[in-house]
Amino acid sequence: MVELKKLQKDVYQNKVNHGFNTTDLNKEFCLAYGELGEAYMAWLRKKDDLGEELADVAIYLLGISEILGIDLENEILNKIEKNSKRVYKEVNGCLVKDKE
């Protein structure tokens, strides 16, 4: 399996190779948000390209992480561990954090 760090570097290099944005983080976050919206619409409409739309979201997250120098794989692993230790309570039918 490919490591996320390698994917981050590959995504960033593809941006450089094609002359895509690598400096305007506001733009990158907006584009990632747009891709998430496209994924949501694909899911609502039960379109066959949902997986591709989710891949677009992941690609933007990988690119943003590389631009910012964040090891996304490490952050994900740490967050999964943190979430596994959280205590939740139900409030109005929704689970919310009670304790870290």
Model-derived regions, located:
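Flexible "arm" and connector segments at domain edges
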Residues: 1-100
